[in-house]
């Protein structure tokens, strides 16, 4: 979708460092740049015109901090600041093919569990920005360190706009963000949620960003974005230390990773941007066709590849557990969390979460349980409910890429569950049963597995994210059924590999 804006471009050209350009032009430390959209629009337009002049295809509106938290004392509404910011960018792009991006940065408050801002409150703040920026051509979510906050922003963009969305996060040299998010978790989660391009901005200089982008390239099929700083500023003078020629040489190296969206962040001037684009025009960009993305799920901080048998702890489930039922009725979260800790300590790779029982608010309990589990550790979750509304509530507040447990061959299940899996970028367990129960024959179970997989892939769910469970009963009770299960597993596995080869 992003490439359709510039169908004949070898690569998409972003702009450079608006904030540092304004500071260089005399903006006082501590001033709110977004207010300049109204009080000194020509100052903003003049900077943006310089980036248009050197070939930038997308100009970021001066709206990075235009949210109700950061602008509480600005004297102008979010709507006024964003509308003025887009007008400035549009004026700078006049007479060219350059597009305008609504620029959305962090709120400036930490989300729970690190802070007090709830996911729902963050979503509402970002929704206000998106609605105010409907006149933009593109939405950019940038300089994020918290995957949970990025998810709130991306959902707000996808649910309230039809514009392409670019998401870039800020990483440390250890390949994690300030809040501990891994590169793989960011790439998987944001692609699953519907971003049109993902990458890295700010953080460090271009050389230091290379291993981060190299890692990201392993975990996403989306176009990759890189928008580095001009190195780090001199602690005495405040001047950024990487000059345009050095910046261009370093940025051009990203072509070997197949990066197709380039720009600059703090300290990058029109000279930096022009030098980089001139060199990139002479540089071959590696194709990223037929990328083999690993089958995996994640929390923000932990990735579990499904490349070997994995242990899923299933004790967070009231079925047959009198004490657990009592904990749910009493809202005893300490007991539930203790069950989680015990399972992780015993070697569980993932935790199944099922809080369904009569007499409680299952949706509310599921939300509280998922949030509580995320507050004590990073073990990825498998979300388990037979009620679609409960499943969606859990998917919405989960921070990462979970497994949905489960979908089956019944038409109602396929219609209700698979769209949720697609929207929230989850993996899913497919059970080989339908309205008639569990088929006795392996071939019939395979037929259901194929039906599930066909419906999933038709929605755009990657085949690697569908885990087929061929089901079985206790072997001592039904020995022939156990044999059929083994045959179904073998046949499904064989056909899956044949399809992959083709």
Task: For the regions a language model picked out, list residue spans one by one.
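Active-site-adjacent loop and "lid" segments of alpha/beta metabolic enzymes
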Residues: 29-32, 98-129, 167-191, 212-213, ...
């Amino acid at each position: 979708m992003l490439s359709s804006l510039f169908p004949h471009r070898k690569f998409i050209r972003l702009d450079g460092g608006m904030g540092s350009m304004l500071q260089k032009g005399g903006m006082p430390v501590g001033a709110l740049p977004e207010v300049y959209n109204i009080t000194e629009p020509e100052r903003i337009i003049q900077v943006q015109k310089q980036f248009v002049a050197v070939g930038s295809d997308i100009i970021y509106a001066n709206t990075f901090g235009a949210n109700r938290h950061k602008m509480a004392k600005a004297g102008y509404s979010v709507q006024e600041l964003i509308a003025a910011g887009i007008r400035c960018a549009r004026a700078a792009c006049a007479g060219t093919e350059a597009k305008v991006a609504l620029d959305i940065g962090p709120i400036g408050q930490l989300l729970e569990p690190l802070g007090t801002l709830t996911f729902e409150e963050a979503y509402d703040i970002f929704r206000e920005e998106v609605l105010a920026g409907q006149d933009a051509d593109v939405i950019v979510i940038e300089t994020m360190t918290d995957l949970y906050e990025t998810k709130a922003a991306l959902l707000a963009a996808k649910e309230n706009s039809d514009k392409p969305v670019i998401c870039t996060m800020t990483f440390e040299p250890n390949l994690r963000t300030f809040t501990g998010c891994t590169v793989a978790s960011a790439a998987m989660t944001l692609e699953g949620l519907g971003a049109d391009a993902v990458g890295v901005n700010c953080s460090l200089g271009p050389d230091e960003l290379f291993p981060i982008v190299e890692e990201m390239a392993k975990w996403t099929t989306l176009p990759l974005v890189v928008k580095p700083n001009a190195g780090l500023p001199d602690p005495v003078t405040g001047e950024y230390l990487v000059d345009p020629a050095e910046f261009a040489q370093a940025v051009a190296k990203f072509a070997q990773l197949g990066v197709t969206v380039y720009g600059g962040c703090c300290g990058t001037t029109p000279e930096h941007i022009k030098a980089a684009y001139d060199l990139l025009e002479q540089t071959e960009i590696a194709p990223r066709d037929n990328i083999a993305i690993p089958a995996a799920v994640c929390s923000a901080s932990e990735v579990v590849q499904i490349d070997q048998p994995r242990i899923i702890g299933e004790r967070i489930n009231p079925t047959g557990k009198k004490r657990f039922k009592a904990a749910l009725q009493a809202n005893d979260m300490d007991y539930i969390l203790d069950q989680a800790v015990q399972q992780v300590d015993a070697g569980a790779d993932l935790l199944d979460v099922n809080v369904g029982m009569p007499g409680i608010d299952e949706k509310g309990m599921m939300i509280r349980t998922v949030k509580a589990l995320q507050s004590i550790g990073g073990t990825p979750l498998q979300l388990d409910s037979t009620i679609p509304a409960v499943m969606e509530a859990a998917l919405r507040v989960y921070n990462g890429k979970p497994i949905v447990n489960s979908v089956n061959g019944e038409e109602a299940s396929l219609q209700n569950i698979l769209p949720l899996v697609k929207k929230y970028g989850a993996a899913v367990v497919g059970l080989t049963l339908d309205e008639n129960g569990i088929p006795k024959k392996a071939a019939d179970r395979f037929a259901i597995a194929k039906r599930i997989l066909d419906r999933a892939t038709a929605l755009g769910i990657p085949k690697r994210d569908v885990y087929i469970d061929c089901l079985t009963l206790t072997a001592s009770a039904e020995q022939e059924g156990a044999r059929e299960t083994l045959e179904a597993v073998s046949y499904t596995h064989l056909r899956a590999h044949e399809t992959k080869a083709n």
